[in-house]
Amino acid sequence: MTTINLGVPEVPAKSPLAPRRKSRQINVGGVLVGGGAPISVQSMTTTLTADVNATLQQIAELTAAGCDIVRVACPSQDDADALPIIAKKSPIPVIADIHFQPKYVFAAIEAGCAGVRVNPGNIKKFDDKVKEIAQAAKDHGTPIRIGVNAGSLDPRILQKYGKPTAEALVESALWEASLFEEHDFHDIKISVKHHDPMVMVQAYRLLAAQTDYPLHLGVTEAGPLLQGTIKSAVAFGILLSEGIGDTIRVSLSAPPVEEVKVGIGILESLGLRPRKLDIVSCPSCGRAQVDVYKLAEEVQAGLQGFPFPLRVAVMGCVVNGPGEAREADLGVASGNGKGQIFVRGEVIKTVPESQIVETLLEEAMRLAEEMQASGAFGDDQAVGAPIVTVQ
């Protein structure tokens, strides 16, 4: 065999991600945040918190989707009164989101919430209340998130900078953190959110360089599902690849479950969380001899919740089809109204197009049974869905 030297130097294999930023670690209701702990995914309920049943139902849906920590709004006394039962019955840690009224901070702490988010920009006389808040939080072991938002920046900071710049967000956050530190309270995480992902990225870079508190990433008011997903993926991708970020919330004008799906997907794509279901599909073209869109959707739907990691290739034409299918645990290379079914690189049968999805699902179940019997994966890995590649 002839060896061709292209003159490209060998580069030692290493992660394309920077090492995680070293940060303090806090405990949010049993979920560790910072200090090298896995990056957690958060969301926020859209129900009236006072409607306990509706709120707990939505929290259950978020939990099933993979949410690690949930936040609930608390704008009224009725909402505050609902916090004890919600905090007690929720399957995941509950954080109370407090604006305007400092009395609800104390109510949330007393209710047993796993954490409290405070917005120093709009809580009345917040600076004067820090000593009491710090003492109450310390007494109950309740971490506090200092959540600075571009849309509700402290008026004093806004007057100084003229607009919510990255520097303004960071100054506000660090100032409030310093007030807690004066009272020997350090069980803190910080967020500096902005609707512009590039301003947000700059703010978190500045913040990460000046403090070791764990950081909660978020693009505030990111927009509808598509736009918000793009903004969050760009911002989170940049920061997480630089090792910045300890917990994330994708803010979308969409059902909260979608926020969780996007957040988990971002972490999976960066290799920061084990992959589950991943649809990698071609945009289709004139070479496609099957309905790739329909096939991809049916395979994805059929394999939701698959209990083991599995790579499945669903190929729409003969250009890359056979090669990709052979590289997968399970796959199909389609053409001329039929599909060759591959299992672990070997063709096992050819089926009509109408039977492709059914056959793939049957083979996936058979592989799952083999994996279960062999004990290839522990209980902690026996969740989620397979990796599906569609071409």
UniProtKB/Swiss-Prot annotation:
Co-factor: note: Binds 1 [4Fe-4S] cluster.
Pathway: Isoprenoid biosynthesis; isopentenyl diphosphate biosynthesis via DXP pathway; isopentenyl diphosphate from 1-deoxy-D-xylulose 5-phosphate: step 5/6
One Pfam entry name: GcpE
Catalytic activity field: (2E)-4-hydroxy-3-methylbut-2-enyl diphosphate + oxidized [flavodoxin] + H2O + 2 H(+) = 2-C-methyl-D-erythritol 2,4-cyclic diphosphate + reduced [flavodoxin]
Broad enzyme group: oxidoreductase
Binding site for [4Fe-4S] cluster: C282, C285, C317, E324
InterPro entries: Dihydropteroate_synth-like_sf (IPR011005), IspG_bac (IPR016425), IspG_bac-typ (IPR004588), NO2/SO3_Rdtase_4Fe4S_sf (IPR045854)
EC numbers, comma separated: 1.17.7.3
This protein's record includes keyword Iron: yes
Chain's role: Converts 2C-methyl-D-erythritol 2,4-cyclodiphosphate (ME-2,4cPP) into 1-hydroxy-2-methyl-2-(E)-butenyl 4-diphosphate.
Name recorded for this polypeptide: 4-hydroxy-3-methylbut-2-en-1-yl diphosphate synthase (flavodoxin)
Organism listed in the record: Acidothermus cellulolyticus (strain ATCC 43068 / DSM 8971 / 11B)
Higher taxonomy: Bacteria, Bacillati, Actinomycetota, Actinomycetes, Acidothermales
